[in-house]
A protein has these predicted regions:
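Short Cys/His-rich Zn2+-coordinating modules
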Residues: 10-22, 35-42
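Short cysteine-rich clusters marking metal-coordination/redox-active sites
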Residues: 34-37, 56-59
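Positively charged, polyanion-binding regions of nucleic-acid-associated proteins
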Residues: 183-203, 234
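Charged low-complexity interaction tracts in eukaryotic proteins
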Residues: 227-253
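Short, flexible, mixed-charge glycine/proline-rich loop motifs
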Residues: 20-31, 44-50
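Long, low-complexity, charged/polar intrinsically disordered regions in eukaryotic proteins
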Residues: 112-191
Length: 253
């Protein structure tokens, strides 16, 4: 995988944002592949496509690309707040590619957040633009990646090191079961994933119960939080994300 942008494409543009859009989209079209099925290359949508930037001709997964000249941060600028919220609740929201690059126009990090990891509480509403702005009153948003469990951060390139394709597709496909869950059930599973992220590789049921107060705040109408924790651990076990060792002991895989 060649991590260098083709800077010759920038000669026809003056706007920094246009240059980065052209260079990053060109790089993804040349070097990117579908994290779901491994198909390469990805195809580009027409420029006026409102939902996504790329799609896979083999499995039809769709991807939107966000690029940034900086280290990978937890807060990512996005577009209109109302549009983003509508997409999260729709059936055709795309997966998100996040790309960071160096001052030398080399890809530092390239990762995907699968669409089934996006929840409303990840989206931060920004203040409306002031009356003096060209788009006065427009409300944008940021994406808070801190809310994404580690399993939902699938790196294709990490610290300028390409990841094996097989590893990428395996991690992506491990969590596809979330797409078949209803919103509330998926929320529980994502919350449990975030809790497990904070535990050591080997943990026990009592360790998981430490999150009971946090989960009670998240789900105040649920009066059986510990039962729910056990249920969610069983789901993660059945999906091959953790291993049950017996006697209330678990191991993260």
């Amino acid at each position: 995988m060649n991590l260098q942008f083709n800077q010759s494409l920038a000669k026809s543009y003056k706007s920094a944002s246009q240059i980065i859009r052209v260079l990053s989209e060109d790089w993804v079209s040349r070097e990117g592949y579908c994290p779901n099925c491994g198909n390469q290359p990805l195809s580009e949508f027409a420029n006026n496509q409102p939902v996504a930037d790329f799609y896979c001709q083999s499995c039809a997964e769709q991807y939107e690309l966000k690029s940034k000249k900086a280290k990978l941060s937890y807060i990512i600028n996005d577009g209109a707040y109302a549009t983003m919220m509508a997409r999260i609740h729709s059936d055709n929201n795309p997966n998100f590619f996040f790309l960071t690059y160096s001052p030398e126009f080399i890809v530092n990090n390239f990762l995907i957040i699968p669409k089934h990891f996006f929840t409303a509480d990840m989206i931060i509403e920004r203040p409306p633009l002031p009356a003096t702005a060209r788009r006065a009153g427009w409300v944008g948003c940021n994406i808070n990646l801190k809310k994404v469990p580690e399993l939902g951060k699938v790196f294709l390139v990490k610290n300028q090191q390409p990841m094996p394709n097989e590893q990428v597709t395996e991690q992506f496909q491990k969590t596809l079961f979330l797409r078949n869950q209803k919103s509330l059930s998926r929320g529980w599973t994502l919350d449990m994933m975030r809790c497990v992220d904070k535990l050591p590789t080997h943990f026990n049921l009592q360790d998981a119960y430490r999150f009971a107060d946090y989960l009670q705040l998240r789900y105040p109408n649920n009066n059986h939080i510990k039962d729910k924790i056990r249920q969610q651990l069983q789901i993660l076990r059945d999906k091959g994300l953790i291993e049950f060792l017996g006697n209330g002991r678990y191991r993260k895989l």
